[in-house]
Amino acid sequence: MNVLYNEYSAILTFFAISFSISTLILALSYFLNPQPSDQEKVSAYECGFNPFDDARATFDVRFYLVAILFLIFDLEISFLFPWSLVLGQLSIFGFWSMIVFLIILTLGFIYEWKKGALEWE
């Protein structure tokens, strides 16, 4: 048990310190809040006048789709970059595993394109 504790003591210490700091900051922000917000403070400010329209407009779902597609292909690049650096040292299995990964992502991209997920009308 002592050996196991020695291996994970740095990680446990890091989690304990980060949890303590997070709790301390949250408690300080709660107790040092100068005053509760009134209706005037939480209202939308528009050049000193009352707002003409509701400030909370709806958000188009296509923006979320574009963000998710960006994350997927950004993740692809994060896998592709280290692979390209060690390509000369990899075996044939490492090469073909990344080719299969790229084929799957390409097929997914073609599927999204055919379904019209990339169309902005």
From Swiss-Prot:
InterPro entries referenced in this protein's UniProt entry, alphabetically: NAD(P)H_OxRDtase_bac/plastid, NADH_UbQ/plastoQ_OxRdtase_su3, NDAH_ubi_oxred_su3_sf
Bilayer topology annotation: Multi-pass membrane protein
Catalyzed reaction equations: a ubiquinone + NADH + 5 H(+)(in) = a ubiquinol + NAD(+) + 4 H(+)(out)
Major site of localization recorded for this protein: mitochondrion
Subcellular location field: Mitochondrion membrane
Documented EC number(s): 7.1.1.2
Keywords tagged on the record: Electron transport, Membrane, Mitochondrion, NAD, Respiratory chain, Translocase, Transmembrane, Transmembrane helix, Transport, Ubiquinone
Keyword Membrane: yes
Annotated TM spans: 11-31, 63-83, 90-110
Superkingdom in the source lineage: Eukaryota
GO cellular component term of the entry, any: NADH dehydrogenase complex
Main EC class the enzyme belongs to: translocase
GO terms assigned for molecular function: NADH dehydrogenase (ubiquinone) activity
UniProt keyword Transport present: yes
Similarity comment text for this entry: Belongs to the complex I subunit 3 family.
Primary role: Core subunit of the mitochondrial membrane respiratory chain NADH dehydrogenase (Complex I) that is believed to belong to the minimal assembly required for catalysis. Complex I functions in the transfer of electrons from NADH to the respiratory chain. The immediate electron acceptor for the enzyme is believed to be ubiquinone.
HAMAP family found in the cross-reference section: NDH1_NuoA (MF_01394)
PANTHER family documented for this protein: NADH-UBIQUINONE OXIDOREDUCTASE CHAIN 3
Protein name: NADH-ubiquinone oxidoreductase chain 3
Source organism (scientific name): Porphyra purpurea (Red seaweed)
Gene field: NAD3
